[in-house]
């Protein structure tokens, strides 16, 4: 699928692996793609910034969400450095990222586009019904439909 990515979309995917590693994740997930998109000069990144989601804020929101999820299942994370708990040299692609990229491919095909661009990736992430990205957006008060309309 990566052969269908445009240049900027490839950069987003590559940067997402760095974001995942920087957050101590053993896998690249949809939320890491979202952070990477927010850091681009592409209109998809601008849409995220206009919605109030800058890359650092997203990283912080991911960390808070992770801690909330652990707390819900009874794991106390106070005093634990979670950023280094799951390090690998290179994170593998996780299910939510793969699903988001599959939806991005469907978006590109549905629009008759030959290549997958950043806008397709963002649309693919916004189409998720469950998972970290919808939780993050809801927690930050972001209307997914409104954000989708900006693309």
Question: What is the meaning of each model-derived region?
Answer:
Residues 1-151:
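Histone-fold recognition with a strong bias for associated Lys/Arg-rich disordered tails
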């Amino acid at each position: 699928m990566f052969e269908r990515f445009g240049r900027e979309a490839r950069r987003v995917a590559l940067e997402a692996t760095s974001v995942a590693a920087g957050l101590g994740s053993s896998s690249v997930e949809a939320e890491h793609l979202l952070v990477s998109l927010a850091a681009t000069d592409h209109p998809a990144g601008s849409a995220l910034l206009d919605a109030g989601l800058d890359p650092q804020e997203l990283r912080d929101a991911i960390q808070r969400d992770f801690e909330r999820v652990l707390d819900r299942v009874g794991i106390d994370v106070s005093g634990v450095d979670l950023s280094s708990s799951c390090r690998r040299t290179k994170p593998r692609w996780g299910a939510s990222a793969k699903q988001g990229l599959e939806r991005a491919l469907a978006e590109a095909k549905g629009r008759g586009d030959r290549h997958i661009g950043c806008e397709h990736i963002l649309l693919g992430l916004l189409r998720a019904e469950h998972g970290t990205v919808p939780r993050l957006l809801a927690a930050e008060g972001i209307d997914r439909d409104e954000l989708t309309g900006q693309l």
